[in-house]
Amino acid sequence: MMSDLPLDLVEKILSRVPATSLKRLRSTCRRWNALLKDRRFTEKHFHKAPKESRVLMLKEYRVFPISVNLKVTPPSVDFKGALGYSHSNSEQVVITEVFHCDGLLLCTTNDDRLVVWNPCLGETKWIQLKVDYRRYVSIFALGYIQNNESCRSYKILWTWYSYDYNSSPPQRGLGFEIYEFSSDSSWRVLDDVNHDSVVNHNSIIRSGVSLKGNTYMLAYDIEENSKFLLMFDFTTERLKRLCLPHFQDVGEMDLSVREEQLSVLNWSRITSKMEIWITNNFDTEATLLWKRVHLDSQCNCVRIFSSLYFDEEKKVVLYCNVKDGETSKKVVYIIGEDDGHYIEIPFVKSIKIERLQLIHTTRWYSLIFNYVPSLFQIQ
């Protein structure tokens, strides 16, 4: 029997079993359960086990798995049942934003709380936001550092904006705070995060993606009229400004992460052309080595909000947004190489454009992203 095997051999075998299969073993053997909770083992498992890549989508304030069938014409999207989590009234919790980090989801809710959630294990951790949270436009990101035992210590970055329209000219503030899971459960102001003045009060930062523990965000400098890539290092707790690829016509942009690759999509409002660049080189100080993906496609879909999922192997882009018009629709787009497919799939009822105001109290945009189940515990 496997339970009689030496522990090191059991560990070697189980470290190569997918996470969704391993979670069912937690209740079968006390010895295995202890191993699966070992943080050293979960780190080893994350790097050695097959990646069960899935596509998740935030729609109607809940998280849904979706599957895409490219073997039919036109391609189709199938929405599965919403993911559930350990909460007495989970169906009543309204999720307004989601940030993914190696199998953990950082969700913002409408009751001034954050929840860190591992859907694979069903574990959650609720975090109360500050009482004055609603005074700001806020962006949250989840990341981690590796401690001396090569185990992860998680942190949450809070980026906020404040506006004072009573002053002349109107004043705009920008601040950063951090929440450490290993601390006394309080928010800490970051005074030196912007050490090299990579951003200022004229910078607009968008919600980003997580890669290797750090957060990558798109940013826009109002004074310079330029876009750039911003990286927050959770170890040094500082921002770093990075270069984007050279686009012929800088337009609307989105970021995506899959299999330790960062993708940036650029969509031209002038030509309606879409192009994608990818990189997996993160060792340079400021200049990333970008590679252009040959996915030439035209899309007449002016966007208000959007998010991106890119599959390089299948040369397919999925993204969701609100289509422009007098009455706006929430739509999933499937776009293939050389206009191989182009399809719009509405996924909620039409809503009036007046409700699509960019304010932090109303969130109507949805998210689509790559998700890989993991055994990381929320500590």
Swiss-Prot record:
Pfam families: F-box (PF00646), FBA_1 (PF07734). It comes from the Eukaryota. Gene3D superfamilies: 1.20.1280.50. Residues 1-49 form the F-box domain. PROSITE patterns: FBOX (PS50181). SUPFAM superfamilies: F-box domain. This is Probable F-box protein At3g22720. It comes from Arabidopsis thaliana (Mouse-ear cress).
